[in-house]
Curated annotation (Swiss-Prot):
Keyword Cell membrane: yes
The reaction(s) this protein catalyses: ATP + H2O + 4 H(+)(in) = ADP + phosphate + 5 H(+)(out)
Subunit-level organization: F-type ATPases have 2 components, CF(1) - the catalytic core - and CF(0) - the membrane proton channel. CF(1) has five subunits: alpha(3), beta(3), gamma(1), delta(1), epsilon(1). CF(0) has three main subunits: a(1), b(2) and c(9-12). The alpha and beta chains form an alternating ring which encloses part of the gamma chain. CF(1) is attached to CF(0) by a central stalk formed by the gamma and epsilon chains, while a peripheral stalk is formed by the delta and b chains.
Recorded name of the encoding gene: atpD
Main location: membrane
Membrane topology: Peripheral membrane protein
Record function comment: Produces ATP from ADP in the presence of a proton gradient across the membrane. The catalytic sites are hosted primarily by the beta subunits.
Name this polypeptide is given: ATP synthase subunit beta
Pfam families named in the record: ATP-synt_ab, ATP-synt_ab_N, ATP-synt_VA_C
Location in the cell: Cell inner membrane
SMART domains from the UniProt entry: AAA (SM00382)
């Protein structure tokens, strides 16, 4: 193991000088002897100097401090010992429950599986959330993005998905908190404990208050743990909240490393960094990784380079809309903007496909009629259009649903609705079976039977 010394410190970026014959490789982990801070080599500048990012605060560092080269990339504990534990970017426990005690550690930088090892699946993963199962169904082993601006419900949707899938699907999950609020991480931990699923989840946090190096690498730490479960032949769920903060951390590091920024100030390597992460999130012939990623949309602009780069990698996109949230309809999923590759009659079956497209057709027609209604009022519409509007408003309300994880706020018990019941309910509305029921009865309920029951008491 070679030793060097710190020659320059600029925030989270540290330059270390080594003897010319013992320069560390890119991605090698270095350890500052005083204080034990870990650095990761990013560039070799020549003359024995390497430029590193600090995986921890650089407060208290000074030039001349001794640095040791470990000779290997950052390695983190993997396997079943990580379940039920909270770890940081280096795989160190931060839940005061003692050592992880894993038998094996894996490097966080790994190659994506080769083409011949990868496999495709068209099997659906039922989430119990009506709007998602109907309009943008998830594939087992697929990638899902939850897109939304600030405060429209990305984290709540993700917590509900984890709760439903962990309880109904009973597989292992890995949750990577990338640059999000520490309070949410804490809420999430307690939510998992109360639902008795904590022993099936590994939690890796690199939150908002941490240096950019931690936020950039924590997604890879979580992914490495998920890959281990997959390679043991399991079907694992990998949740990332929030993929935008991963990009943002890359932007901060890129600027500190002296690279020229590209569009909107993002790093020039944006597409490559996203690809490195996303290509590893894949299913192989041994096991599968199903990933759900929350994607913050800056200023509600889906054409921003960061969400736009993410779109390309996903099988399903769930778009959360501020307009729908302002109507008080939660989950605020936009049924006209959300898409899924699985919504194909050969995958979901003809009935599901027809009902989903029928729902979208009626909502699209209602959207077109809104201008006419605003100018001329409902009375000017034809009888057919009045019927479309009435059914569309019922569908809009029936797409809302009380969540288990939001019981504290809403006061209504959460509902899990099977795909069969979801299709049956929407099919009934489309065919006019519930035209006699007032639209208020469709708001914040589970299955269609509850609507009928609610209408009786109105």
């Amino acid at each position: 193991m070679s030793a060097g010394k710190i020659v320059q410190i600029i925030g989270a970026v540290i330059d270390v000088e080594f003897p010319q014959n013992a320069v560390p490789k890119v991605y090698d982990a270095l350890k500052v002897e005083e204080g034990g801070l870990t650095l990761e080599v990013q560039q070799q500048l020549g003359g024995g100097v390497v430029r590193c990012i600090a995986l921890g605060t650089s407060d208290g560092l000074k030039r001349g401090l001794a640095v040791k080269n470990t000779g290997n990339p950052i390695s983190v504990p993997v396997g079943t010992k990580t379940l039920g534990r909270i770890m940081n970017v280096l795989g160190e426990p931060i839940d005061q429950k003692g050592e992880i005690g894993a038998e094996e550690t894996w490097a966080i930088h790994r190659e994506a599986p080769s083409y011949e090892d990868q496999s495709n699946s068209t099997e659906l993963l039922e989430t119990g959330i009506k709007v998602i199962d109907l309009i943008c169904p998830f594939a087992k082993g697929g990638k899902v993005g939850l897109f939304g601006g600030a405060g429209v419900g990305k984290t709540v949707n993700m917590m509900e998905l984890i709760r439903n899938i962990a309880i109904e699907h009973s597989g292992f999950s890995v949750f990577a908190g990338v640059g999000e609020r520490t309070r949410e991480g804490n809420d999430f931990y307690h939510e998992m404990t109360e639902s008795n699923v904590l022993d099936k989840v590994s939690l890796v946090y690199g939150q908002m208050n941490e240096p950019p190096g931690n936020r950039l690498r924590v997604a890879l730490t979580g992914l490495t743990m998920a890959e281990k479960f997959r390679d043991e032949g399991r079907d694992v769920l990998f949740f990332v909240d929030n993929i935008y903060r991963y990009t943002l951390a890359g932007t901060e590091v890129s600027a500190l490393l002296g690279r020229m920024p590209s569009a909107v100030g993002y790093q020039p390597t944006l597409a490559e960094e996203m690809g490195v992460l996303q290509e590893r999130i894949t299913s192989t012939k041994t096991g599968s990784i199903t990933s759900v990623q929350a994607v913050y949309v800056p200023a509600d602009d889906l054409t921003d380079p960061s969400p736009a780069t993410t779109f390309a990698h996903l099988d399903s996109t769930v778009v959360l809309s501020r307009n729908i949230a302002s109507l008080g309809i939660y989950p605020a999923v936009d049924p006209l903007d959300s898409t899924s590759r699985q919504l194909d009659p050969q995958v979901v079956g003809q009935e599901h496909y027809d009902v989903a497209r029928g729902v979208q057709g009626i909502l699209q027609r209602y959207k077109e009629l809104k201008d006419i209604i605003a100018i001329l009022s409902m009375d000017e519409l034809s009888e057919d259009d009045k019927l479309v509007v009435a059914r569309a408003r019922k569908i809009e309300r029936f797409l809302s649903q009380p969540f288990f994880v939001a019981e504290v706020f809403t006061g209504s018990p959460g509902k899990y609705v099977s795909l069969k019941d979801t299709i049956r309910g929407f099919k009934g509305i489309l065919e006019g079976e519930y035209d006699h029921i007032p639209e208020q009865a469709f708001y914040m309920v589970g299955s269609i039977e509850e609507v009928v029951e609610k209408a009786k008491n109105m």
